[in-house]
Amino acid sequence: MDIIINSIKYNNSLVDGPGIRTVLFMQGCDIRCEGCHNQSAWDIKDGKKVSIRTLAKELNEKVINKKITISGGEPLLQKEALVELINQLNIMHFDIALYTGHTREEVPAEIIAKIKYLKTGSFVKELKTTVVPFVGSKNQVFEEIK
């Protein structure tokens, strides 16, 4: 199975969940928040198609501490591929955070069962914050799942 990604930032983020994290930006977004910091990830056609098996292998080799945040774009647009990727990363013992602009209720239970952190809610420019950890606006919720 393939997945469409925008980019990967290896082992350098302190703002996308606890610890130093790698961030996988998935391609495609149905929310398109005003003030989005990653508009290049909006159009699904602009992404790079990769095999999930190849991607998981690359992440396993390059992510030093096994901490990854899956962001976007909007990861839930590729729900089936996202589930498969999370399953593979779980086998490799990754600490997984998922960032979605959707509500918690829209995140499939099979995903919630396999991640450690979840950030929900779309970015609202008027509620932008730099003091609430791991979120961009005050309406967003960051929670530890397990």
Q: What positions do the PLM features span?
A:
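N-terminal [4Fe-4S]-dependent radical SAM core
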Residues: M1-F25, E34, N38-I44
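Flexible loop residues that form catalytic
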Residues: A41, G73, S122-F123
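Canonical radical SAM enzyme core domain
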Residues: D43-A56, L76-I112, Y117
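Short Fe-S-cluster ligation motifs
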Residues: A56-L76
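P-loop/Walker A phosphate-binding loop and immediately adjacent motor/lid segment at beta-alpha junctions
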Residues: L76-N87, K128-K146
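Non-cysteine beta-strand/loop elements that form the S-adenosyl-L-methionine
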Residues: K116-V124
